[in-house]
Amino acid sequence: MRAEPWQKAEVPGPLKASVITKPEVVVAMVRRARRPLLIVGPEASQAGLGDRRLIDYAVLIAKAGKMGVVATAQTVGEFLKKGFQGAVWMPAMDIANRLCDPGWKGLDGAGRYDLVLVGGIHYYVEWVILSALKHFAPSLKTVSLDRFYQPHATWSFPNLKVEEWLKQLDLVVSGLEKTGG
């Protein structure tokens, strides 16, 4: 488990993501959040092992955490295939820009988000989005759910093998289901 950026050419600066060594950290953050949001990208339908995909975990996390969901690219169709109706479609860069806007009141008009979980977005795109949020929305906490370390997130898993990553996601889901989000 290494906390080194997967993308070597970029330098994240002096402030790097804290490493998620215990999935309970993610569960506690979601529980404490007033307005959590989950952003899911197109790799969610491919990332995983066997019949377990990130999209399946995204549905479970969204339901258990009682959070809004933004699906980027064609991902909204994947949510519909899973029977999840609560996903809103928006381009990845658009949701990033809106989250940086202090005047934006959220997808439902109920106010700003205080926690954003991100997964399934191409590594280099997620890198740029998280960098923008780190610098232009500093009060927003971010969590990368992907298996490669994202230094611009507030919290990120280290570089993990697929099997270990899925175990961590299983623990996040079971923790959220136990605590009721």
Give the predicted meaning of each segment:
Residues 2-9, 14, 121-181:
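Glycine-rich, acidic loop regions that bind phosphate or pyrophosphate groups
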Residues 1-71:
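Cofactor-pocket helix-loop regions in the catalytic cores of large enzyme subunits
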Residues 49-66, 70-135, 154-157:
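Glycine-rich, anion-gripping cofactor-binding loops and their flanking helix/strand elements
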Residues 42-44, 73-76, 147-149:
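Short, ordered loop/turn segments at secondary-structure junctions
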